[in-house]
C-alpha cells in the first residue's frame, strides 16, 4: 500500500487501485488482528502467573492488545473487525494520500505491557522490565508446549543480572 501511495505522484492511476486494495487489506487485517488478540489472551494468562511467581506475588502483570481505535473488540467476528478497519481506513484516506504513507492497519498494532497498572515502557524499573520480559518468554514456552506437546529449548543469557535478590530466587 505504501508503494502505491508513494508512486501515485508519478503514476496517478495507481490511486484507482487503492479502494479495492484497502478492502482486501481489511479482510486480511481482520484475520491477523483476531489471531493476534487470541494469542495475546493466551500469553496474558500464562505471563501473569509467571510474573507473579517471579515477583513474589508483589506485582501484577497485565497485557492488552492495542489496535486501531475503530476496532472495539479484536476478538469479534472477522467480518465485524473488517468493517471497523474499513471505517478507520476511510477516515484516514485523505491523510494517507497527502502523506503518501500507510497510516493505519495491523502493522501499527502493539501489545501494551503493564505492571501494577503502570506502563512497563514508561514507568517500570529495569528489574521490573526484565521480570516482565522473562514472564513473557516463560509464557511463550507454555504456549509452545500446549501447541506441540513438548517444551522448546530456551537459551536465556544473563537473566538474573538486573534482578533484586527476591526476584532472583
Give a label for each model feature:
Residues 2-13:
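A sensor for short, sequence-defined functional sites
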Residues 12-27, 31-155, 161-166:
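Conserved NTPase motor "head" modules and their coupling/switch loops across ABC/AAA+ ATPases, GTPases
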Amino acid at each position: 500500500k505504501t508503494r502505491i501511495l508513494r508512486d501515485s505522484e508519478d503514476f496517478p492511476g495507481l490511486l484507482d487501485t487503492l479502494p479495492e486494495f484497502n478492502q482486501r487489506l481489511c479482510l486480511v487485517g481482520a484475520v491477523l488482528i483476531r489471531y493476534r488478540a487470541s494469542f495475546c489472551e493466551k500469553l496474558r494468562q500464562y505471563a501473569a502467573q509467571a510474573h507473579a511467581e517471579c515477583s513474589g506475588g508483589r506485582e501484577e502483570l497485565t497485557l492488552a492488545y492495542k489496535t486501531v481505535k475503530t476496532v472495539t473488540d479484536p476478538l469479534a467476528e472477522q467480518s465485524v473487525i473488517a468493517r471497523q478497519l474499513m471505517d478507520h481506513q476511510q477516515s484516514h484516506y485523505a491523510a494517507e494520500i497527502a502523506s503518501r504513507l500507510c497510516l493505519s492497519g495491523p502493522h501499527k498494532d502493539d501489545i501494551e505491557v503493564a505492571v501494577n497498572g503502570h506502563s512497563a515502557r514508561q514507568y517500570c524499573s529495569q528489574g521490573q522490565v526484565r521480570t516482565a520480559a522473562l514472564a513473557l518468554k516463560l509464557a511463550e514456552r507454555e504456549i509452545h508446549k500446549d501447541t506441540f506437546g513438548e517444551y522448546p529449548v530456551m537459551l536465556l543469557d544473563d537473566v538474573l543480572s538486573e534482578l533484586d535478590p527476591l526476584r532472583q530466587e
